[in-house]
A protein has these predicted regions:
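N-terminal presequence-like segments and the immediate start of the first folded domain
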Residues: 2-95, 99-112, 118-166
């Protein structure tokens, strides 16, 4: 037995009004855009013999974008520069970024984003001073992450970059 309410019976409330929409007229299919030509990634090799044994490349160029792998304080011979000296290590990492970008026909002013990793937050100012000096007023978007350690013993800083080749 249905109970009464102000709106009528509950059984009656379960019945809903149906709204019937008329079907929209058929449209012509939109013209398809031709597919963009595939852009192949290009490996960037700065010519360092020591990095041949690594499972990655120092940079990739895709169209006008250049992705620079994390650079550390290793010189062209693969030797650690500036053990215990964050400024010297930052200088070498930035020099390596510059070298990778140059191999792709770009420069430091083309950098649009940088990510840095340091092992000691107290060394941030020293690292930042050197980076700012080298970038000479150029200010890319940036992130800094403090980490417990980097890939090899003695490393204090690692920096990666994304650049837009003009």
């Amino acid at each position: 037995m249905a109970t009464k309410s102000k709106r009528g019976t509950r059984a009656g409330a379960a019945k809903a009004h149906r709204i019937v929409k008329k079907a929209a007229p058929a449209r012509k299919p939109a013209a398809r855009r031709p597919a963009a030509p595939a852009v192949k990634p290009i490996d960037i090799d700065p010519g360092w013999a020591w990095d041949d044994r690594l499972p990655f490349v120092q940079g990739k160029q895709i169209g006008n974008l250049i992705y620079v792998s994390g650079q550390v304080a290793l010189d062209p011979d693969g030797k650690l520069v500036g053990e215990g000296d964050i400024k010297a290590q930052t200088r070498q990492a930035m020099e390596n970024i510059k070298t990778v970008l140059a191999a792709a026909g770009a420069g430091l002013r083309d950098i649009i984003k940088m990510t840095g990793f340091i092992t000691d937050a107290d060394k941030y100012r020293e690292m930042s001073e050197v980076r700012s000096e080298i970038l000479d007023g150029h200010r890319p978007a940036s992130t800094l992450v403090v980490v417990k350690a980097l890939a090899f013993p003695g490393l204090m800083v690692e920096m990666e970059a994304i650049a837009l080749k003009r």
